[in-house]
UniProtKB/Swiss-Prot annotation:
The keyword Signal does not apply. InterPro entries: UDG_fam1 (IPR002043), Ura-DNA_Glyclase_AS (IPR018085), Uracil-DNA_glycosylase-like (IPR005122), Uracil-DNA_glycosylase-like_sf (IPR036895). Its main location: cytoplasm. It comes from the Bacteria. Belongs to the uracil-DNA glycosylase (UDG) superfamily. UNG family. Its EC number is 3.2.2.27. GO terms for molecular function: uracil DNA N-glycosylase activity. It comes from Deinococcus radiodurans (strain ATCC 13939 / DSM 20539 / JCM 16871 / CCUG 27074 / LMG 4051 / NBRC 15346 / NCIMB 9279 / VKM B-1422 / R1). This is Uracil-DNA glycosylase.
Length: 247
């Protein structure tokens, strides 16, 4: 009987949206089609099973922190990473950032080195907690938002890329200027999603020690502030607090 026509012209019920807790209303509205989509339900089921069998980073309450700390209406910079750190206590939902008290990873150490050369007076902190950037409108987004402990890229191809492409498209739809910072070949493939006439794309090699020669000297942070100021948007204060505690 499944091939019988629907006599009342009614479509099957769409899946109910799965909306993460404490998400800003503008993200909820922009991403509602994603939260309602079958792939997102499948991704949620996959993660539920993964957490039963493996240690998954970041912890569930932190997965959407990039969106929580930076509402869509406040985004003026997007820095795209690939997937979360896969070591203990590192990942907390912001690309390139680690929790207070955790050793600064090599890529972030190189980011600090470039900041020291690029931004007059910048002093590299002893921590790697980038929340103060997020709270200024810097969306620190990974393309994949979860990972198995010790297994880099283990959650690629499970649906996250579809979701984070939708995030990038939502930011691209903004009329006011956003600066997109794309480091490395993986991030640079997302350039095709950025079509807004007011936006600026800054791209270079990845800050990883494996490709640092294509990153050092590119001055992405001063270029970002110049682009923002030309559009009448305030610059980012890249200097991080000397001491931090996780809230």
């Amino acid at each position: 009987m499944t091939d019988q026509p629907d006599l009342f012209g009614l479509a099957p019920d769409a899946p109910r949206p799965i909306i993460p807790a404490n998400l800003p209303e503008d993200w909820q509205e922009a991403l509602l089609p994603e939260f309602s989509a079958p792939y997102f339900h499948e991704l949620t089921d996959f993660l539920r099973q993964e957490r039963k069998e493996y240690t998954i980073y970041p912890p569930a309450p932190d997965v959407f922190n990039a969106l929580r700390y930076t509402p869509l209406g406040e985004v003026k910079v997007l820095i795209l990473g690939q997937d979360p750190y896969h070591g203990p206590n590192q990942a907390h939902g912001l690309s390139f950032s680690v929790r207070p008290g955790v050793r600064v990873p090599p890529s972030l150490r190189n980011i600090y080195k470039e900041l020291t050369e690029d931004i007059p007076g910048f002093v590299a902190p002893k921590h790697g907690y980038l929340r103060s950037w997020a709270e200024q409108g810097v969306l620190l987004l990974n393309a994949v938002l979860t990972v198995r402990a010790g297994q880099a890229n283990s959650h690629q191809g499970k649906g996250w890329e579809h979701f984070t492409d939708a995030v990038i498209k939502a930011v691209n739809a903004k009329e006011e200027r956003v600066v997109f910072i794309l480091w490395g070949s993986y991030a640079r493939k997302k350039k095709k999603l950025i079509t807004g006439k007011n936006h600026v794309v800054i791209e270079s090699g990845h800050p990883s020690p494996l490709s640092e020669q294509y990153f050092f000297g590119t001055r992405p942070f001063s270029k970002t502030n110049e682009a923002l100021e030309k559009a009448g948007r305030g610059p980012v204060e890249w200097q991080l607090p000397a001491t931090v505690t996780e809230e």
